Amino acid sequence: NQIQESVISNLTLENKIWALSNETDLPILNSYQYTIGANYSKNKWIIDFEAYFKKTKNINTLDFDFNNTSLYNYSIGTSSIQGVDIFIKKQLNKYSTWLSYSFNSAKYRFDDLNDGNPFPSNVNIDHTVKWSHFYKWKKIDFSLGWLWHNGKPYTKINTTSDENEISEYSYSNLNNEKLKVYHRLDFSMVYNFRPHTNKTIKYRLGLSIMNLYNRKNIINKDLRFSNTNSEELKINDIRGAKISPNIVLRVFW
């Protein structure tokens, strides 16, 4: 069975660890799923649609107390996932483009967490859009892709101080905040050629640039206590890769 384990240093909700199931405190997961879809293909158009719903029971969570990691709460709950995927592609001679949209709502519910109210899954991203372009010119293949999606959920930390100025920290509602919107543009080109001296060998030379406009995306939040005696809590933004060029050479024989 899989247990969702909360991590103190991370403002998203959980890690995933594995344990053997039993008939008492670690029951076997039980789930069901419904899916419906449709597909259209004509005149170099492709349109694909799919909707789904999944319910899972007997999910386990191990939730640590924020101020004392030796204390923890063990809970069994459920998860529900529902979503829609739409894919559209068009081919025009040596150029093709495709656009996709995904809606996803994934929530957990545990009697002993979040006052028994449902809360978003750690990986829940409501809306995702991808738009890609491909073009072939002689022996060179070009591609351009744009990705956009909502920020991932995370849990806000509340700070309180007593009369002795000793700080205590607690969670607010689980995963009730979201990171900023994520988006980036990627470019690549690949050149395929053979040397005149040996036709049995094929070369592929490629150039790719990820995050072309150098978007400073926040992909997570991390918290650490400072090294001072005050034990001040520091919350840091973890950012994704900056603009990243890559060159690759492959040899086939």
Pin down the residues of each PLM region.
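Residues on the lipid-exposed face of transmembrane beta-strands in outer-membrane beta-barrel proteins
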Residues: 36-40, 86-90, 99, 131-135, ...
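Short loop/turn motifs that connect adjacent beta-strands in outer-membrane beta-barrel proteins
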Residues: 44, 94, 139, 194-203
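Gram-negative outer-membrane beta-barrel transporters
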Residues: 52-55, 70-158
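Extracellular loop and loop/strand-boundary signature of outer-membrane beta-barrel proteins
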Residues: 19-25, 33, 69-75, 83, ...
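Transmembrane beta-barrel strands of outer-membrane/channel proteins
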Residues: 1, 17, 38-40, 49-53, ...
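Residues that define the transmembrane beta-barrel architecture of outer-membrane proteins
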Residues: 30-34, 41-43, 53, 78-82, ...
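Surface-exposed extracellular loop regions of Gram-negative outer-membrane beta-barrel proteins
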Residues: 1-34, 51-74, 145-166, 216-220
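C-terminal beta-signal and adjacent terminal beta-strands/loops
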Residues: 57, 148-165, 184, 191-253
